Amino acid sequence: MIEDFSSPNGWDVLWEEHEAYQSCASIKDSMRDTYAMGLIHTFSDEFKELYEEYQGNYNDEYNTKLSEIFNRHDNETIDKVQESLIELKDYIYGFEVDTGKSDIVTQKVGINLCWSGDAVYSMDTAEENEVLLYFAIPSYCCNIWFDAFSILSEVKDERLDAAYSFLDFISSPLIASENMDYVGYTPFIAGDDVFSLVEDWYEARDVDENDEYIETEGTIPYDLSYFFRTNEDDETEYVLYVEEDQINRQMRAQYPMEEDLPHLAIMQDFGETQNNKIVSMWEKVKVNPLPIWVVIIVVGGFVGLLSFFGSYKLIKKAKIRKRKKLREK
């Protein structure tokens, strides 16, 4: 399964009549994230052509072209994505916002389109019950998501100072590492405190009597230098040796491999007009029109119930009148 979703064809698998995956995937009830998924599938041929054109040389130029396709939101694109997402509903379990991270642990669903921190939560929780879950990044394109704090433009004086102080506080490496330890989400902050926490979590080598790492079978190098180096002149090697399955588990969810980065794109703002159109499109996708035969049965059943209860009340009234007449005699 993990190979299917990590492949260039990773997103498209969900749109196929696949016995193992049919009706077992939950998708985010999140307009932007699911629009991104639908767009990647809709233009999968273009993404694949680009992927093959730059095979082995995924650079900034490649990412720029990738992002151009990924950020289409013209009217024609919106209509095509809507068709793709409506079609997707025939193959999935349903939409969710927050239950997916638990549903996949309890095996109510088998696949979940998830945010990285939720993926870590699910994998950690399942592992407590001796169940292994895996995290996949489809290789030709994936959405970069992030949360952010914002300061209102009209805030002034001491409130503005307080806001900046709070941002400084949560952005310090020590506090960032404590937050990551609590919620499982990766901060944009580097620093030794954060790296030490990641090292505590994932470094799998044994140590000798001098507390020095020694070569350990079943571990592979995982280079995080791209993230933790402080500047271009920093030559520090931030390499962990992790268990082999971490390539598709918590490590990959929290810190993608450097080779993943060119295939990741950031969705830009749609603009007010197109954003409203995509909101409208998303509402149409989520509406679940019932087949006419279901409507007939439901309405017929409802009318039947009304008729039954109506008849029941008439019969009851007739019996009451009859008893009254008997008492009068």
Predicted regions and their residues:
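Extracytoplasmic/periplasmic substrate-binding proteins
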Residues: D90-D157
